[in-house]
UniProtKB/Swiss-Prot annotation:
Region (Small GTPase-like): 29-246
GO annotation (BP), single: negative regulation of transforming growth factor beta receptor signaling pathway
Lineage: Eukaryota, Metazoa, Chordata, Craniata, Vertebrata
NCBIfam families: small_GTP
Gene induction: By TGFB1.
UniProt-annotated stretches for the region Disordered: 205-226
Molecular function GO labels: G protein activity; GTP binding; transforming growth factor beta receptor binding
Transmembrane portions of the chain: none
Name of the protein in question: Ras-like protein family member 11B
UniProt organism field: Homo sapiens
Length: 248
């Protein structure tokens, strides 16, 4: 597995509508591109989640999250896709409202899907989910962006502040998939959360028909010859031949 870490921050992304953004569905080697942003409060394990998914390794300590972009290839239903995963700095809350920088908003607009992460050891991170989900959907008006809610640190039951069942109920109410994971102990659950998003985005990107089929459908099919008309022409030709033989 090849992993490329591009040391670029969300501030460096092309704004929606730019030429670079218009080609956002095509990745390296012409493969379809899937873009996922990982968001949530500070300290919930976003970076650990991303690195665990991409490398299968767990690293406990990280430097302050600067918003790095990671790229790899994934297999979804037999097709190789180019996947980009954007790690993001922790979201803050001021006076019961989200404080999202424009750089973070651009990252969310850039994404084809979003992972919202909270920690079962931090009730405030759980309280962010509804506001954050609403904010994500507001930045994608006119389309239903695929979102997965992930409850991290499931192994730390001795300091649990949030029952995972609450996360499941909230995710269901918001129309999102839900995964309870322990990034430090279980790779499979982490993989499943990202895989279901990649699959959903892949299905949304697939056109109803291929360009070749669409072009073919525009070409009028030749009309089938009328059988009665053919019989009439055949009789006329046969009668003419009989008259010619008789005259001779």
């Amino acid at each position: 597995m090849r992993l490329i870490q591009n040391m670029c921050t969300i501030a460096e992304y092309p704004a929606p509508g730019n030429a670079a953004a218009s080609d956002c569905c095509v990745g390296a080697a012409g493969r379809r591109l899937v873009k996922i942003a990982v968001v949530g409060a500070s300290g919930v394990g976003k970076t650990a989640l991303v690195v665990r998914f991409l490398t299968k390794r767990f690293i406990g300590d990280y430097e302050r999250n600067a918003g790095n972009l990671y790229t790899r290839q994934v297999q979804i239903e037999g097709e190789t896709l180019a996947l980009q995963v954007q790690d993001t700095p922790g979201i803050q809350v001021h006076e019961n409202s989200l404080s999202c920088s424009e750089q973070l908003n651009r990252c969310i607009r850039w994404a084809d899907a979003v992972v919202i992460v909270f920690s079962i050891t931090d009730y405030k991170s759980y309280e962010l989910i509804s506001q954050l989900h609403q904010h994500v959907q507001q930045l994608h008006l006119g389309t239903r962006l695929p979102v997965v809610v992930v409850a991290n640190k499931a192994d730390l039951l001795h300091i649990k502040q949030v029952d995972p069942q609450l996360g499941l109920q909230l995710a269901s109410m918001l129309g999102c998939s839900f995964y309870e994971v322990s990034v430090s102990e279980n790779y499979n659950d982490v993989y499943s959360a990202f895989h279901v998003l990649c699959k959903e985005v892949s299905h949304k990107q697939q056109p109803s028909s291929t360009p070749e089929k669409r072009r073919t459908s525009l070409i009028p099919r030749p009309k089938s010859p009328n059988m009665q008309d053919l019989k009439r022409r055949f009789k006329q030709a046969l009668s003419a031949k009989v008259r010619t033989v008789t005259s001779v």
